[in-house]
Amino acid sequence: MTDKNVNPDDDQADENRDDNVDERFADIVGDVDIDADQSATDSPAPEELSRESQLEALLAERTEDLQRLQAEYVNYKRRVDRDRALSRQSGVDKVITDLMPVLDSIAMARQHGEVEGGFKLVVDELEKVANNHGLTSFGEVGDVFDPNLHEALMQMPMEGVSVTSVSQVMQPGYKLGDRVLRPARVAVSDPDPNATSADESSQADGESAQADEDDETPRNE
């Protein structure tokens, strides 16, 4: 039996080849582990999905609460602004109502020519302040009677009047903006029904006389 000669270099090559195989195997296994870890990371766990759904539901609920709170605030601010305006208007109404008797006295004094000198300056300033708050007076002789604006204290027929009109102003009326605070107290004149009848009678007499003249006119035969 003959012994084969063993080459040391061949043994070393085999060892190197085995080491390379081991390294390649380790690399492949490592890549597989990394891919598995990456897949596990990319696919959320059921617990994470449940947590995300809870957060989304909570966010939607808080958003709805915020929108509701914002709407309530807008309504509250609108109500406060309205109440503030009403309160201010109520204060103006009270002051103007208290001033009306003074303004009546001033109007009467002006009719008698008693608003002169320094007193006139005070009167003009007072009326200016009242006008700045929207107060206006109304009621003049010759105005067509309006029951929404005038209170008739006296009423009498008058010739030459075609519609019921103001013939005398006892007390002026006042408006605050478009709202009537007090109607004007007036005497009114109505069309005279007797005068109308007399006019109609005169017209009828005239037509009758004209007809008689036509009857008496000779006719050419």
UniProtKB/Swiss-Prot annotation:
Main location: cytoplasm
SUPFAM superfamilies for this protein: Coiled-coil domain of nucleotide exchange factor GrpE, Head domain of nucleotide exchange factor GrpE
One GO MF term: unfolded protein binding
Biased composition (Polar residues): 194-205
Gene this chain is encoded by: grpE
Entry similarity comment: Belongs to the GrpE family.
Keyword tags: Chaperone, Cytoplasm, Stress response
Residue stretches of biased makeup (Basic and acidic residues): 14-26
InterPro entries associated with the record: GrpE, GrpE_coiled_coil, GrpE_head
The protein's role, per its UniProt record: Participates actively in the response to hyperosmotic and heat shock by preventing the aggregation of stress-denatured proteins, in association with DnaK and GrpE. It is the nucleotide exchange factor for DnaK and may function as a thermosensor. Unfolded proteins bind initially to DnaJ; upon interaction with the DnaJ-bound protein, DnaK hydrolyzes its bound ATP, resulting in the formation of a stable complex. GrpE releases ADP from DnaK; ATP binding to DnaK triggers the release of the substrate protein, thus completing the reaction cycle.
GO cellular component, one term: cytoplasm
Places the protein is found: Cytoplasm
Protein name: Protein GrpE
CDD domains in the cross-refs: GrpE (cd00446)
PANTHER family, per database record: GRPE PROTEIN (PTHR21237), GRPE PROTEIN HOMOLOG, MITOCHONDRIAL (PTHR21237:SF23)
Bias (Acidic residues): 210-221
Lineage: superkingdom: Bacteria
Assembly behavior: Homodimer.
Segments for region (Disordered): 1-53, 180-221
Gene Ontology terms: biological process: protein folding
Gene3D superfamilies on file: 3.90.20.20, Head domain of nucleotide exchange factor GrpE
